[in-house]
C-alpha cells in the first residue's frame, strides 16, 4: 500500500469536540484503516462495531503492530504507552472516521459521480467510466465489479460501496495518481451506514426504486428516504457546480426531486418534456450482434443514436451516464458520436459465445423489477425461440422477493432454480422461495450453481436462448462457513456449450 503524506495529528482531530483521549496523541500519522491486518507503525485504526465483526476486539493487536492512534466507541485497559485511544460516541464513529480519512488523504478531490437506485447502478457507473475513457480522460469506478482504474482489471473490494475509510483511501489513491474521475455505486445500505460521509460528490444520479432490501429498510417509504440521503451529500455550498440527475419515469422521482437542492437534470423514455428524452426506440440484429437505436431530444437539439445494448431500460441507463458526462462540458453531438464505440457491459445484458448455435445471455438481475425488465428486453431475441432461464437466491439476503421472482420468470419455457452464494442458509429454503411463485411445472432445482449452469446448457438445443440471471460476471460462490470457491456463469456456460456442440 502506498504511504500517504504524514500530517499533524492535532490538525486531524481538532474538529472532534466530544471525545475522551487516553494516552498521548502522536504528532504525525501515516495511513488509516478499519482493517486490523493493514495497520503498520504510525497508522490510525478505526474500531467499527459491525454486524459480524467488532473492531474493538482487535485494538490490542493493532497497538502491538505499532498503531499511533485508535478511534473507538468504548475503552478497556489498553497499554497506551506508545499509542493514543480516542473514544467517541458510537453513532458518530463513521462520521469521525470519514473526517480523519479525508484529511489524511489531503482532501482527495477528484470529479465524482455517485449512482444510486435499485437497478442500474453498475451499468451506469461503468458507462460513465467507459465514456470518459473513450474521450481520452483518466477515470475509475467503484462498485459491484470492484475498484478499477483506467483500463486495469478491477480489484474486488467486498461490498458494492466499501467502508467509509476504504472509500476515502481509494479516492486519495486516485488523487495521488492524477486520475481525474470516479464513478461509484452508492447503495442504500452504504448511505444508512455512513459509508459515503464527507465524500465530495459532483453529480448524483438516481435510477429507480423497486421492491428490494425490505429486510433492511422495512418498507418502501423508508427505502425511498434512505436513497434520497445521497442528495444531502451534495450539501448547500454553491461555490462549485453540483447536479442531480433523475429518472423522471420512476414513481419515486418527485421525492428525489424535492430532496435535491442543486440543479436537476432529468431524463425519460416516456415523458417528452424531460430534459433528455429518448423515443423511437428500435432493436435489431446485425451480423449476430444486437443493437438499439433511438432518437434523443436534448437541450442542444435532436440526434439519432445507436448503442450496442438492448432493452428500453438500457436506454435509460445510457441517458443517465450520457448526462453525467455531458455535465463536464462535452457537446451532445460529441457524446452521440462515441456511443457506437462503447462495448458490452460485463454481466449486464451481456450476450456470450456468438459462435455458438444457442444465444447465452448473462445478467445481474436479482430483483423482481430486474427480472421483468430482463425478460422484456430480450423478448425480441426470444421471439419464436425456446427460452431457458437459470436463477438463484442468495443467502443472507431479502428472500421475501422470491415468490414474485418465481412468478415473473415463469414466462420462460424452462427454469433451473439454484442458489447464489447461499452462505449458511438452507439451500432448499432459498430455492423454495422462488419455487413458491412458479406458475408452471417446467422447472427443476439444482442447488450448486456450477452444476446448475452445466445442467441448463445440457438442456439447450440449437436455436434456444439461455438466460443466466442473478450473478453476472461475479467469479465466486460463498458457501457454508464463509468458504469462497471459484465460479463464473459465463466461463462455465461457454465451456459446457462448446463441448456439447463441438465448437472449438
Predicted regions and their residues:
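ATP-dependent carboxylate-amine ligase
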Residues: 1-20, 41-44, 320-347, 351-504
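Glycine/threonine-rich flexible loop motifs
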Residues: 52, 56-58, 193, 215-222, ...
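A short, gly/pro- and small-residue-rich
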Residues: 55-67, 86-91, 202-208, 223-228, ...
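Short acidic/polar active-site loop segments enriched in Thr and Asp
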Residues: 68-69, 180, 202, 413
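Acidic, Mg2+-coordinating active-site environments of NTP-dependent enzymes
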Residues: 76-81, 203-360, 435-440
Amino acid at each position: 500500500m502506498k504511504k500517504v503524506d504524514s500530517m499533524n495529528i492535532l490538525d486531524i482531530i481538532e474538529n472532534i469536540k466530544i471525545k475522551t483521549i487516553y494516552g498521548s496523541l502522536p504528532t504525525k500519522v501515516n495511513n488509516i484503516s478499519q482493517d486490523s491486518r493493514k495497520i503498520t507503525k504510525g497508522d490510525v485504526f478505526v474500531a467499527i462495531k459491525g454486524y459480524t465483526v467488532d473492531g474493538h476486539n482487535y485494538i490490542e493487536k493493532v497497538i502491538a503492530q505499532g498503531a499511533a492512534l485508535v478511534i473507538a466507541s468504548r475503552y478497556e485497559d489498553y497499554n497506551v504507552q506508545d499509542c493514543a485511544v480516542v473514544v467517541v460516541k458510537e453513532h458518530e464513529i463513521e462520521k469521525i472516521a470519514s473526517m480523519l480519512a479525508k484529511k489524511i488523504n489531503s482532501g482527495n478531490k477528484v470529479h465524482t459521480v455517485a449512482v444510486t437506485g435499485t437497478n442500474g447502478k453498475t451499468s451506469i457507473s461503468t458507462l460513465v467510466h467507459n465514456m470518459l475513457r473513450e474521450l481520452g480522460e483518466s477515470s475509475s469506478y467503484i462498485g459491484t465489479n470492484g475498484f478499477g482504474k483506467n483500463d486495469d482489471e478491477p480489484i474486488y473490494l467486498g461490498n458494492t460501496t466499501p467502508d467509509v475509510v476504504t472509500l476515502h483511501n481509494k479516492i486519495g489513491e486516485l488523487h495521488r495518481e492524477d486520475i481525474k474521475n470516479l464513478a461509484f455505486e452508492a447503495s442504500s445500505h452504504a448511505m444508512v451506514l455512513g459509508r459515503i460521509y464527507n465524500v465530495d460528490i459532483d453529480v448524483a444520479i438516481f435510477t429507480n426504486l423497486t421492491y428490494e432490501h425490505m429486510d433492511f429498510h422495512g418498507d418502501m417509504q423508508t427505502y425511498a428516504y434512505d436513497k434520497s440521503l445521497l442528495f444531502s451529500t451534495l450539501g448547500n455550498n454553491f461555490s462549485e457546480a453540483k447536479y442531480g440527475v433523475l429518472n423522471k419515469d420512476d414513481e419515486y422521482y418527485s421525492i428525489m426531486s424535492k430532496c435535491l437542492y442543486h440543479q436537476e437534470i432529468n431524463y425519460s423514455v416516456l415523458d417528452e418534456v424531460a430534459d433528455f428524452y429518448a423515443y423511437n426506440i428500435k432493436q435489431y440484429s446485425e451480423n449476430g450482434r444486437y443493437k438499439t437505436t433511438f432518437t434523443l431530444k436534448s437541450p442542444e437539439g435532436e440526434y439519432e443514436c445507436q448503442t450496442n445494448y438492448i432493452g428500453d431500460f438500457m436506454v435509460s441507463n445510457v441517458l443517465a451516464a450520457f448526462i453525467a458526462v455531458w455535465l463536464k462540458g462535452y457537446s451532445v453531438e460529441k457524446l452521440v458520436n462515441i456511443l457506437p464505440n462503447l462495448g458490452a457491459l460485463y454481466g449486464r445484458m451481456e450476450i456470450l459465445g456468438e459462435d455458438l448455435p444457442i444465444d447465452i445471455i448473462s445478467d445481474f438481475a436479482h430483483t423482481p423489477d430486474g427480472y421483468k425488465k430482463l425478460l422484456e428486453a430480450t423478448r425480441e431475441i426470444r421471439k419464436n425461440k425456446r427460452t431457458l432461464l437459470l436463477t438463484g437466491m442468495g443467502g443472507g439476503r431479502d428472500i421475501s422477493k422470491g415468490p414474485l421472482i418465481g412468478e415473473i420468470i415463469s414466462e420462460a419455457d424452462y427454469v433451473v432454480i439454484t442458489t447464489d452464494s447461499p452462505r449458511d442458509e438452507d439451500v432448499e429454503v432459498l430455492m423454495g422461495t422462488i419455487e413458491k411463485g412458479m406458475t408452471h411445472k417446467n422447472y427443476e432445482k439444482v442447488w450448486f450453481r456450477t452444476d446448475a449452469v452445466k445442467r441448463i446448457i445440457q438442456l439447450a438445443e440449437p436455436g434456444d436462448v439461455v438466460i443466466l440471471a442473478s450473478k453476472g460476471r461475479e467469479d465466486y460462490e460463498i458457501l457454508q462457513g464463509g468458504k469462497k470457491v471459484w465460479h463464473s456463469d459465463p466461463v462455465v456456460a461457454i465451456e459446457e456449450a462448446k463441448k456439447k456442440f463441438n465448437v472449438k
